[in-house]
Amino acid sequence: MKSLKELSLRIKNIRSVQKTTKIMQMVSAAKLLQSQKKLSNSKLYISKLHSIISSLMLSVDQELLAKILNVSNNGSYLVFIVASDRGLCGNFNSSIVKFSQNKLITNGKKVDIVFLGKKAFDIGKNRFDSKSILKIENSKGITLKHVEALVGGIDLSKYDKVKVFYSKFYNTFTQKPMLETIKPWSKDSSLIDNSLAGPITDYGYEYEPQNIEFILKSLVQDYVVIALYSALLESATSENSARMVAMESANRNTKEILNKLALLYNRSRQAAITTDLIEVIGGAESL
């Protein structure tokens, strides 16, 4: 049996850990609310944008549509893997990397990978057979302007497809790894909310300049930026939720450990007192 001093020190250390996990849980809860608000605004915007593009494309023939969507066959993919810079969020980072590894079918294509998040890079840098791998840290601090600069600095025309792996937020306890293709543009997207998008109709828009090709090209380019930014917000919200749940679980575990240690401490203390009493009584009888 451990000594009272050892038990007391262990209880003190675990209480210190419990304070840390409680603070992290509260911070994650506050960040979760903030990221949910940003995600809600982003989802409304991208859903409306997707609906407008879908409606405008109804008036475009297939030849012009292929030109607008910049469909190419250059033999290469660009892949973004969105995760976190930090740990202590359960299997959040490892699950998205594992999902990406399982779902990324290259068909012999050259693949350039961009990891948005240090942890994803650390876990996945040796798992992908890719000659070009880039890491971007502080993924949660990336703003819309940063994404615009990032996408603007990439020649998307040299890629057949641009894919994004991210963690989609459903609720506090449910986040699922997802794969979204943001180039070429698709009428189906996991990033949009159909209840927010509105109906897709061909009743006709009035637009200036009266050049449907120019307008659609601009909107599709904007959509790539917004889609990547939305994936980052989905991932940040999922991360905050996963960390909050992980810290809540850690708090429960520390409570259980503290209860067991308190019981063990009391028993050890009681045994020590009993031993002392026996020694005192034995000493008195010898007199």
From Swiss-Prot:
Localization terms from the record: Cell membrane
Keywords linked to the UniProt accession: ATP synthesis, Cell membrane, CF(1), Hydrogen ion transport, Ion transport, Membrane, Transport
Bilayer disposition of the protein: Peripheral membrane protein
SUPFAM superfamilies on file: ATP synthase (F1-ATPase), gamma subunit
Coiled coil regions in record: none
Ligase listed as a keyword: no
GO biological process, one term: proton motive force-driven plasma membrane ATP synthesis
Keyword Lipid metabolism: no
GO cellular component entries: plasma membrane; proton-transporting ATP synthase complex
Role, per record: Produces ATP from ADP in the presence of a proton gradient across the membrane. The gamma chain is believed to be important in regulating ATPase activity and the flow of protons through the CF(0) complex.
Family per similarity comment: Belongs to the ATPase gamma chain family.
Subunit structure: F-type ATPases have 2 components, CF(1) - the catalytic core - and CF(0) - the membrane proton channel. CF(1) has five subunits: alpha(3), beta(3), gamma(1), delta(1), epsilon(1). CF(0) has three main subunits: a, b and c.
Protein name: ATP synthase gamma chain
Organismal lineage: Bacteria, Pseudomonadati, Pseudomonadota, Alphaproteobacteria, Rickettsiales
Gene: atpG
